[in-house]
Design a protein with these regions (language model features):
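K/E-rich alpha-helical interaction surfaces of small helical-bundle regulatory domains
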Residues: 1, 36, 226-242
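RNase H-like DDE/DDD metal-dependent nuclease/strand-transfer catalytic core used by mobile genetic elements
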Residues: 88-95, 100-112, 118-220, 224-226, ...
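Short, polar/charged, Gly/Pro-enriched helix-capping and turn/loop motifs at alpha-helix termini
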Residues: 42, 75, 151, 155, ...
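Residue-level "edge-of-site" marker
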Residues: 60, 78, 158, 189-191, ...
Length: 291
């Protein structure tokens, strides 16, 4: 992660009752430099989790930040609270999105794929891909399904590979999830706030990770992204979780994934037609277009 190393700060019980204010302030400043985009309340919780006691209030943390020139406009913006919907249990809905692509030092563009669980905010995937095609995305989502099980629904935007700019037909991604019994949901066009938690994650990912690293190549990106994912899930407190971490609220799905797709079963009162590869059946007015 960004900033200075804290290798000398052991996770043994620490109390500062007899320390002078400058000594307390020095430790707080060291933590702030390690986590420069983390606000006072969350940093206060992180230090508490690291077994520091008798800490000053988060308000005093902010005063210390100001005295030491450690308050940024980005951090203030990130502290703004928003009203959001929330699902009732883990894996009821996953949210997926590509963070805006950027050029790595080797000249190749990186397309970060991020997927979070709506209920717990657990980041399930933070992968540096080289494109946004279904063929590149699918193996990573299959790995998630094998590791965490199947969600009940999957919220994504209308861009590749999730959706289409047209209102007709289904994408390969939608058909695949349909066969697995997972409902695909799409955000409203030009309304990214529908995926507020995923957009919020992308913002945190940018401020707390990408801003502080020059990424050489895909291998380097994978290492940096995984380090941030561990921090985000297991160390970083979340205001919406009462300052708990996502991993404390997440449990895998009981719906197991199988790469073998079951055959569809129909009742006797339904007539089954074969269609062409484009989804059109010539002897019927019904037209289902697969793209």
């Amino acid at each position: 992660l960004a900033g200075e190393s804290l290798t000398d700060l052991k996770k043994a019980p620490k109390t500062l009752p007899n320390k002078t204010d400058p000594e307390i302030e020095k430790v707080i400043v060291e933590y702030r430099k390690k986590y420069p985009a983390i606000g006072a309340v969350k940093l206060h919780r992180i230090m508490g989790n690291d077994n520091y006691t008798d800490l000053p209030s988060p308000r005093t943390f902010n005063e210390i930040f100001k005295r030491n020139g450690l308050i940024t406009r980005e951090a203030s913006t990130a502290a703004t609270h928003y009203q959001r919907f929330e699902k009732s249990y883990p894996n009821e809905m996953w949210q997926a999105d590509f963070k805006g692509n950027f050029k790595m030092e080797n000249g190749i563009r990186c397309h970060p794929l991020n997927i979070i669980d709506d209920y717990s905010r657990m980041n399930l995937c933070c992968e540096p891909l080289l494109s946004e095609t279904f063929s590149e995305v699918k193996p990573h989502i299959e790995r998630l399904f094998s590791t965490y099980g199947l969600p009940f629904s999957f919220l994504c935007d209308n861009g590749n590979p999730w959706g289409t700019s047209q209102s007709t037909g289904f994408t390969n991604f939608e058909v695949w999830l349909m066969e697995l019994g997972v409902l695909t949901l799409h955000g409203r066009f030009i309304h990214p706030q529908t995926q507020g938690k995923e957009e919020r994650f992308n913002g945190s990912f940018t401020r707390e990770c990408l801003k502080y690293h020059k990424i050489k190549d895909q291998t380097d990106a994978s290492k940096i992204f995984e380090e941030y994912r561990d921090f985000y899930n297991n160390i970083r407190p979340h205001m919406s979780l009462n300052l708990e971490v996502p991993s404390s609220r997440y449990t895998p799905s009981t719906r197991k994934y199988s790469s073998k797709i079951s055959e569809w079963e129909y009742t006797d009162d339904l007539k089954v037609h074969k269609v062409k590869s484009n989804g059109i059946h010539n002897n019927s007015r019904a037209r289902i277009l697969f793209k």
